[in-house]
Amino acid sequence: MPNLDDQLGAELEQLQAGGLYRTLRAIASAQGPRVIIDGREFLNFSSNDYLGLADDPLLKRATINAVERYGVGAGASRLVCGNLAPYADLEEKLARFKNKESAIVFGSGYAANVGTITALVGEGDVIVLDKLDHASIIDGARQSGATIRVYPHKNLKKLSDILEKCGTFRRRLIITETVFSMDGDLAPLDEILELKEKYGAWLMIDEAHATGLYAKNRRGLAEAVGVEDKIDVTLGTLSKALGCAGGFVVGSRVLTDHLRNKARSLIYSTAMPPCIVAAAGAAVEFVMSEAGHQRRDALWRNVSELKNGLSRLGLQSASRSPIIPIAIGAESAAMETSEKLFEQGIFVPAIRFPTVPKGKARLRVTVTASHTAADLQQFLSIFAAISKRIGSTVAVGVNPE
């Protein structure tokens, strides 16, 4: 039998040959619109820190104060002795913010999805997924033991056809992101809810990229569409617009009690550090405030400005989020474009298979409230020049689907 290094080395060589080999670049600064890499400053257009809270003084003060009081590590899982006081405060704020009866916090959005899905359904049940649902949703579905059905992206006719044939299953769970993480487009929640009601299914939504950004109260897309009360399970993250780390689920108290008792990713994980939990509580309070409203509005002004700039370059974007995908196609071409931008001081890593389908590599450009007008113009100018220079080998377009 070949040894481990020989076999894994061969797999790595295949990744390199296919333009799929991944490396890590160390960032030697706080997260923000400008970051330091290898001693050089770069404009960062790849962050999910949409509201610029990751380095906000308010959150840093909350973190420092919590470290002074609670130390660093939680010491155990939440169900042993790791459920320090900031957890109750954060969960109360999340429930109030999301206008739900109860909330429960997980160590990450990934853990929240996997733990929730596996706690809700199993053998004898069916999960119906959008083809572009996040990997954490797919992994949770696979681990659950339930039957999995997948419908083409946002194809309501196919979703209806699948649900019509699932009447013999004990439980039917539809799961969709509200803002899709790689394309930046929005789920048709109204229509999905009609099908949920028609076929007696449950609906779970992942508001990871919507929390803090949409609707009057900034609760997410479900609020914007006016359907919050019709959703069975709402998931979100603390790591994107809220600038921290972790994931959460909001809903009925019965739901959160069930997850506390059944979600293995919660039960068997050491709790998040209390300082991060305290910072997340401060972030939720900020997002609910008038200052949070103003920060959100600044984000959308920047999104509009960048989309208008891309339009002037002939790239029309259908994105209705801060995620603006620039479709390249071939993995090698996407890597080349990303490296050319990096040489010019723009940090936008290429997104490749398996994160997106083969042949649909892209630049996933993200905008934050912290970017200045000068930052946006600098990106547009450099991107325009690079696109012309390598245009013979790169077919550039906005929105891959």
Feature-to-residue mapping (PLM):
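Active-site phosphate-binding strand-loop segment of PLP-dependent enzymes
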Residues: 149-205
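Structural motif of enzymes handling amino- and sulfur-group chemistry
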Residues: 271-291, 302, 307, 311
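Conserved PLP-anchoring active-site segment centered on the Schiff-base-forming lysine
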Residues: 116-135
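Conserved PLP-binding catalytic core of the aspartate aminotransferase-like
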Residues: 293-304, 311-345, 355, 359-360, ...
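Active-site PLP attachment segment
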Residues: 217, 223-258
